[in-house]
Amino acid sequence: MTSPRVNLLDFDADQMAAYVAGLNEKPFRAKQLMQWIHQRGVSDINDMSDLAKSFRATLLDKVEVLSLPVIKDEHATDGTRKWLLDVGAGNAVESVFIPEDDRGTLCISSQAGCAVNCRFCSTGRQGFSRNLTSGEIIGQLWFAEHLLRNDPEAIRRIEKYPTPGWEHTGRVISNVVMMGMGEPLLNYDNVVSALRLMLDDRAYGLSRRRVTVSTSGVVPMIDRLAQDCPVALAVSLHAPNDALRDQLVPLNQKYPLRELLDACERYLPFAPRDFLTFEYCMLDGVNDSDIQAKELVRLLRNIKCKINLIPFNPFPESGLKRSSAQRVNAFAGILLDAGMVATVRKTRGDDIAAACGQLAGDVVDRTRVRERDIHSAEIEIAEVESDVQPNEQPIEWLKKLT
């Protein structure tokens, strides 16, 4: 019986070196393979011309360079591009490329589905299927980078607005954010293996400042990441107190805000920048009041951070609404007046459901949570009187979503 082929995308630099050594080849062959695969985007062993013919013959019988099959390739009017990728057994994940004037950002997935089940995120609606392998994670970058290098539209844009690395390496993707489907820190080993490849000069050579892991707050893994591979960290916060965050981000019930913020402060000395990012999805009448803005200031004022306010991207089953632009600006104004650094994220790719919180996979619904009668639920939000303490704000309406 023929042994299954080894997918070389599954190997980081150390694993590649060990594999090559196991074939009784010299160490420099591992570097050659890394460069052919990750820097040049070559998947056919026969095209790796500076490898010895005997080595190529050995590899042809044992290995492959296999990225995920593409189910759908969608283009948004703003230049954003989304790929639906097949990970087998009826599962799919999504990757999104976001072109900007000074960078090209790829948003990648770490899991098929997500178990965290944040109330405002469509990915959580489908439940959790499995972790992606390191090859499936890095394969999203491999596929997108080398496809875009040969895409006339992408080349025209990048020649007009060069991204970091373009002139010297021909690299289209300058930034990677792990903000796609899944909770990266619940797939820790595979994510870290993929991160190391992104940073490795023999592969993609990205700066730690340009690679971001977004987490909803897996406290023990934040501490491990600080030691193992400290890239930029973004924390999905979305609420200024435990009572509300318990409802919006159920993981908060296991790792409440005080534990999460303590972990963030421990991470800061290892971070590639001198600040962390906190993401805050703006939900109409839920977490966007002046009182909650002031509470957020009190919560974060002693942490070096940037607060990224994200307009909610609606999907039918959520029962939630996006805060108005006026409310977002007023909320941001309170943060800025208090001396906080705050930005409002520009929504991209709405027309192809590629915006933040919209990635759900165009696949068979495998939701493992109770059926929710969301469509008919009327959200009743009690008026918050001026003498009500922030941590006493009513959250009964959220129980209709569970």
Curated annotation (Swiss-Prot):
Q: Please state what class of enzyme this protein is.
A: transferase
Cofactor(s), names only, from the UniProt record = [4Fe-4S] cluster
Q: Does the keyword Zinc apply?
A: no
Q: What cellular component GO annotations does this protein have?
A: cytoplasm
Gene3D superfamilies associated with the record = 1.10.150.530, Aldolase class I
Q: Which reaction does it catalyse?
A: adenosine(2503) in 23S rRNA + 2 reduced [2Fe-2S]-[ferredoxin] + 2 S-adenosyl-L-methionine = 2-methyladenosine(2503) in 23S rRNA + 5'-deoxyadenosine + L-methionine + 2 oxidized [2Fe-2S]-[ferredoxin] + S-adenosyl-L-homocysteine; adenosine(37) in tRNA + 2 reduced [2Fe-2S]-[ferredoxin] + 2 S-adenosyl-L-methionine = 2-methyladenosine(37) in tRNA + 5'-deoxyadenosine + L-methionine + 2 oxidized [2Fe-2S]-[ferredoxin] + S-adenosyl-L-homocysteine
So which domain of life are we looking at? Answer: Bacteria
Q: Name one Pfam family in it.
A: RlmN_N
- Binding of [4Fe-4S] cluster: at which residues? 114, 118, 121
Which EC numbers does the record give?
Answer: 2.1.1.192
Active-site residues (renumbered): 94, 356
Note the SS bond partners. 107-356
Cofactor note, please? Binds 1 [4Fe-4S] cluster. The cluster is coordinated with 3 cysteines and an exchangeable S-adenosyl-L-methionine.
Indicate yes or no for the key word Transcription regulation.
no
- Domain named Radical SAM core is located at 100-351
Q: Which GO terms describe its biological process?
A: rRNA base methylation; tRNA methylation
Q: Which GO terms describe its molecular function?
A: 4 iron, 4 sulfur cluster binding; metal ion binding; rRNA (adenine(2503)-C2-)-methyltransferase activity; rRNA binding; tRNA (adenine(37)-C2)-methyltransferase activity; tRNA binding
Task of the protein? Specifically methylates position 2 of adenine 2503 in 23S rRNA and position 2 of adenine 37 in tRNAs. m2A2503 modification seems to play a crucial role in the proofreading step occurring at the peptidyl transferase center and thus would serve to optimize ribosomal fidelity.
Another remark in the UniProt entry says: Reaction proceeds by a ping-pong mechanism involving intermediate methylation of a conserved cysteine residue.
- Entry's family note: Belongs to the radical SAM superfamily. RlmN family.
Name assigned to this protein: Dual-specificity RNA methyltransferase RlmN
This protein's species is Polynucleobacter asymbioticus (strain DSM 18221 / CIP 109841 / QLW-P1DMWA-1)
Q: What is the lineage of its organism?
A: Bacteria, Pseudomonadati, Pseudomonadota, Betaproteobacteria, Burkholderiales
